[in-house]
């Protein structure tokens, strides 16, 4: 009779357990890496009776105060928000939209997309798409006459339609402003679409407290993932957040709107880059991603355009707030977009 050779591992509990422990350790390391920014469910702003708007940028003013811009307002300025976080759970406990601070600056709609707070001067800077400028405002919402000295290559003629300045952030430790266009400049490459599958080639621009350009770094997005062409489509970088160590968090956002709205989706990815490394393009460190949808089973579609740091939470992590743009509650008889806020945790920063 031929003797069957049975693997020893089936009868060696110690050896088998050791293999299992090694595998578990490996996957634990992977999980820890992927969860540097643990997921948190998004919350509707309407639960606190905050009216829908076109919220496109957010910055922290300290404690529970934030400044938020809306890109369809006739006045140029920002809304003051009070957002109270649960320091243990990292969720929003209470939110309130307070006064609007702003003024007429000449344009019917300046299309404010990004906002940053400078605590040293107690002023706010607002980046707008309609004029491709970043203007400084006092804390009462009046122009100071100062602005970031953007290079001529970022002029209105250099951008694709509705793909101009989108992001703005400032870090008081590095004394640096950062801004970037949502999409490639015309001179830097063709428009990224679902058909050509090319990445956006972007220029991350750094400015000092003197508002002068002090650095330019090349950043490439992932390629579009949409499979179909559609006129209602947005792809590129929608927000930046500058960290104390000189690195940047970059929010890549792809928004696909189906022809009859059902089956629309938004995919967001957060990467970290280190401009000081001087790579071309900058090497990206993946941090976190999520997708929201409008379909038969999920109706949480959210177009995230704002991102900023918040306070330190009880576990020592730092709150990272994301804010979505509902296009003023855009929709039809069966569904309307909602404004959402999402809080993530940054650990080890």
Predicted segments, located by residue:
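Sequence/structural signature of beta-propeller domains
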Residues: 35-349
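Bacterial Sec-dependent N-terminal signal peptides
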Residues: 1-38
């Amino acid at each position: 009779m031929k003797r069957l050779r049975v693997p020893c591992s089936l009868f060696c509990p110690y050896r088998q357990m050791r293999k299992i422990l090694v595998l578990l350790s490996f996957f634990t390391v992977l999980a820890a890496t992927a969860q540097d920014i643990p997921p948190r469910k998004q919350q509707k702003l309407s639960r606190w009776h905050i009216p829908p708007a076109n919220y496109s940028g957010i910055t922290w003013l300290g404690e529970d105060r934030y400044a938020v811009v809306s890109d369809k307002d006739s006045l140029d300025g920002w809304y003051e928000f009070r957002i109270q976080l649960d320091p243990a759970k990292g969720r929003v406990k209470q939110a309130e939209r307070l006064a609007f601070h702003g003024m007429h600056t000449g344009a019917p709609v300046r299309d404010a997309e990004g906002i940053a707070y400078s605590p040293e001067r107690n002023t706010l800077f607002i980046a707008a798409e309609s004029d491709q400028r970043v203007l400084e405002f006092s804390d009462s919402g009046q122009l100071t006459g100062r602005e970031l000295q953007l290079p001529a290559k970022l002029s209105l003629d250099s951008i694709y339609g509705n793909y101009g300045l989108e992001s703005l952030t400032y870090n008081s430790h590095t004394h640096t402003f950062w801004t970037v266009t949502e999409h490639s400049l015309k001179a830097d490459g063709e428009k990224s679409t679902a058909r050509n599958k090319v990445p956006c080639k972007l220029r991350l621009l750094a400015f000092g407290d003197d508002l002068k350009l002090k650095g330019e770094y090349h950043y490439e997005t992932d390629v579009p993932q949409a499979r179909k062409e559609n006129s209602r489509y947005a792809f590129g970088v929608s927000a930046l957040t500058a960290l104390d160590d000189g690195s940047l968090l970059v929010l890549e956002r792809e928004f696909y709107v189906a022809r009859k709205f059902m089956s629309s989706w938004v995919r967001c990815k957060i990467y970290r880059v280190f401009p000081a490394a001087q790579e071309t393009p900058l090497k990206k460190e993946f941090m976190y991603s999520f997708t929201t949808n409008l379909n038969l089973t999920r109706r949480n579609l959210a177009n995230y355009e704002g991102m900023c740091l918040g306070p330190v939470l009880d576990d020592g992590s730092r709150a990272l707030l994301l804010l979505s743009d509902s296009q003023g509650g855009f929709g039809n008889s069966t569904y309307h977009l909602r404004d959402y806020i999402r809080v993530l945790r940054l650990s080890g920063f």
